[in-house]
């Protein structure tokens, strides 16, 4: 879901059952926005609730992991969608590097744009492989850079 009031944008898991969340605008939770999805995925991997193959463990496999019990569940299908997004981002980056004839090591800075980039916990994105680990320390959120760049050219 988009980053609207009530979207879970932050999540931290304590133990195996206590997911503490923050929503946009501190409103009642209505779903997960992109940054919330990354946080939940990271926490489930960190606590070995999702294994290295991306399989949600028992007893959560059938119904999903309760992010907000009785209301919002993170399912096996959600995990597959994250895996597909990771694959697309990594493939895109690899093609860009190959076409530019440069390596990860030669990258000095990566600007992560948009509202998603501003709210993204870079360490969690690195931790789940959404972004290559070689970019640690090189990631800079820049917000709505398209709008800013267009204003510069007016």
Q: How should these model regions be labeled?
A:
Residues 83-105:
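Phosphate/ATP-binding catalytic cores across multiple sugar-kinase/actin-like superfamilies
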Residues 51-60, 98-108:
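Flexible, glycine/charged-enriched surface loops at secondary-structure junctions
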Residues 76-85, 129-150:
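Glycine-rich and small/hydrophobic secondary-structure elements
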Residues 104-124:
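Glycine-rich phosphate-binding loops at beta-strand->alpha-helix junctions
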Residues 38-85:
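Gly/charged contiguous loops adjacent to phosphate- or pyrophosphate-bearing nucleotide/cofactor binding elements
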Residues 8, 16, 100, 104-105, ...:
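Non-transmembrane, aqueous-exposed alpha-helical and coiled segments at domain scale
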Residues 1-35, 121-143:
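Glycine-rich phosphate-binding loop of actin/hexokinase-like ATP-binding domains
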Residues 152-154:
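Conserved small/polar residues in nucleotide/adenosyl-binding loops
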């Amino acid at each position: 879901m988009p980053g609207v009031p009530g979207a879970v944008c932050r999540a931290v898991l304590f133990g195996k059952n206590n997911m503490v969340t923050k929503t946009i605008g501190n409103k009642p939770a209505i779903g997960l926005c992109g940054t919330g999805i990354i946080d939940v995925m990271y926490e489930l991997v960190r606590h070995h609730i999702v294994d290295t193959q991306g399989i949600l463990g028992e007893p959560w496999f059938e119904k999903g992991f309760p992010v907000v019990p009785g209301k919002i569940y993170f399912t096996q299908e959600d995990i597959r969608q994250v895996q597909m997004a990771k694959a697309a981002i990594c493939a895109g980056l690899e093609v860009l590097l190959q076409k530019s004839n440069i390596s990860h090591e030669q990258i000095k800075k990566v600007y992560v744009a948009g509202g998603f980039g501003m709210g993204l916990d870079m360490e969690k994105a690195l931790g789940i492989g959404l972004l290559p680990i070689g970019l640690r320390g090189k990631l800079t959120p820049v917000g709505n850079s398209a709008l800013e760049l267009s204003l510069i050219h007016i």
